[in-house]
Regions:
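Secreted/periplasmic proteins that engage bacterial cell-wall peptidoglycan
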Residues: 1-21
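Extracytoplasmic/secreted envelope proteins and their assembly/folding machinery
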Residues: 3-7, 36, 54
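Aromatic- and glycine-rich peptidoglycan recognition patches
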Residues: 15-34, 46-48, 52-84
Length: 84
């Protein structure tokens, strides 16, 4: 799932973040989308992704489509969180 994907990426680099997308929406420091940097969490209603720059995110979309790159604004952004 989406939060498991972001949890695993951060964990692989030695960072601890909460497990669910709801909890991840509160971790780290909030920043404006206009200041987003690669590695920031982009939080949506019931979904979370990682910003990779250039207005793009990488995320676990669905079981059928798997991990994919999408435009960050493909749905309304609720929060941007900087963990690192």
């Amino acid at each position: 799932d989406c939060s498991g994907f972001t949890f695993r990426i951060y964990s692989d680099f030695g960072y601890s973040i909460p497990r669910t997308s709801y909890e991840q929406r509160s971790c780290g420091t909030g920043v404006d989308y206009s200041s987003a940097q690669p590695g920031d969490l982009i939080c949506y209603d019931g979904h979370v992704a990682m910003y990779i720059g250039g207005g793009l995110i990488v995320h676990a979309s669905t079981q059928r489509t798997g991990i994919k790159v999408s435009n960050a604004n493909y749905r309304p952004i609720l929060a941007v969180r900087r963990v690192v």
